[in-house]
Amino acid sequence: MEINKFICSQGPKKNSCEDFWRMVLEQESCIIVSLTETDDEDQVCYEYWVKEEDYELAFGRYVVKTLEIIEESSFTRTRLRLTDVSSDTSREIHHFWYPHWSDYGNPTNPAEILNLISKVNQKRKEMKKTADSQPGPIVVHCSAGIGRTGTFCTIDNALSQLRKEQTVCLPQTVLKIQKSKI
């Protein structure tokens, strides 16, 4: 199990988007996985990025610009530019959005989740090879930050363990995750 691979978070609300982006920048995260719908009423998760290319949103001192949107078969991958205007620092963020997993539900197609996990890990591996420094933790969120988020991280860890050891014990995997606070 890779320690500090993930930051598990609730979906940002309108009043916490600036804090969310501050965390992403401070933790040097370059990948975000969103496992929830967004809504304008701010009940589930506020729309903290623009779903159209070449548009931007400002949250306090942070500006988020959408550079590219790539529609995959079951999720949307978006390249964003996050800029802290007070320090003029910026970072490219890869955002993976999978809104088809309902709260308190199961994924309708487990192969889609496995594909999403594979693509996220592929992007992280690619970034580790090309970056001057190691990318920070992957930020994973749903609405509350526990159910779908925890399941995503558990599946990722179980798959990693299965590849390395040819066996997996889910209860032990969950306990390790809880103890390490990945």
From Swiss-Prot:
One of its GO terms (molecular function) is protein tyrosine phosphatase activity. Keywords: Hydrolase, Protein phosphatase. It catalyses: O-phospho-L-tyrosyl-[protein] + H2O = L-tyrosyl-[protein] + phosphate. The active site is at C142 (phosphocysteine intermediate). Residues 1-182 form the Tyrosine-protein phosphatase domain. InterPro entries: Prot-tyrosine_phosphatase-like (IPR029021), Protein-Tyr_Phosphatase (IPR050348), PTP_cat (IPR000242), Tyr_Pase_AS (IPR016130), Tyr_Pase_cat (IPR003595), Tyr_Pase_dom (IPR000387). SUPFAM superfamilies: (Phosphotyrosine protein) phosphatases II. This is Probable tyrosine phosphatase protein H4. It comes from Microplitis demolitor bracovirus (isolate Webb) (MdBV).
